[in-house]
A protein has these predicted regions:
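N-terminal active-site beta-alpha-beta segment that forms phosphate/nucleotide-binding
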Residues: 1-115
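Conserved phosphate- and dinucleotide-binding cores of soluble alpha/beta proteins
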Residues: 81-188
Length: 188
């Protein structure tokens, strides 16, 4: 399955077909892996996401970043089509944005990608080589090239797909975190 449209369709359907208890267990397993991961524990500035459309919920991770006094950044889709990483002090600051997704407000401080230690990136599918298939808007592919830290995809075990083809503009991730483990891309 290498056609991105077919991959997106199949993975979205599979995510949405998960029972709530399966989603909750996956979120718990992923959070446990991230919270114990040395890369996460060393990160002072973490760029993450608020789950939507069946994505793995990172709620416990977001709360841990805030509780530990580290910097939590969340994405905001801007009117010009760009994505920015904005600092939040509490999850209560979030409101539905451009695509109906919960995001920081326009007054939340912007952080440059070069200041991020760890980016936890959603995706529709991931390859073991780091290829990431996103929603199709290219937001992360435009944002991640400026990242100096580690980019880690987050998904369910079934979102690891063999044979994904990268396009010229696709930006790979260094790791993929799933309920089943943390994959160092290109190492297996």
């Amino acid at each position: 399955m290498t056609d991105k449209r077919a991959v997106r369709r199949a993975m979205r359907a599979r995510r949405m077909a998960l029972a709530e208890c399966e989603r909750a267990q996956a979120a718990q397993d992923v959070a446990g892996r991230i919270l114990a991961w040395p890369v996460y524990r060393a990160a002072r500035t973490v760029f993450a996401y608020v789950a939507a459309r069946g994505e793995v919920d990172l709620g416990p991770v977001l709360c841990d970043v805030l509780a530990s006094g580290r910097t939590l950044l969340l994405p905001r889709c801007e009117a010009d089509g760009a994505m920015t990483a904005r600092r939040v002090q509490t999850l209560d600051e979030l409101a539905p944005g451009t695509w109906g997704l919960d995001e920081p407000g326009p007054d939340a401080p912007v952080c440059a990608p070069g200041r991020i230690d760890l980016a936890l990136v959603p995706g529709v599918a991931f390859g073991r080589d780091g290829v990431r298939v996103g929603q199709g808007g290219g937001y992360y592919d435009r944002y991640l090239p400026g990242l100096r830290g580690v980019a880690a995809g987050v998904g369910y075990d079934f979102q690891i797909v063999d044979g994904l083809q990268a396009s010229a503009h696709d930006v790979p991730v260094a790791f993929v975190v799933t309920p089943g483990g943390i994959i160092r891309c290109g190492q297996e």
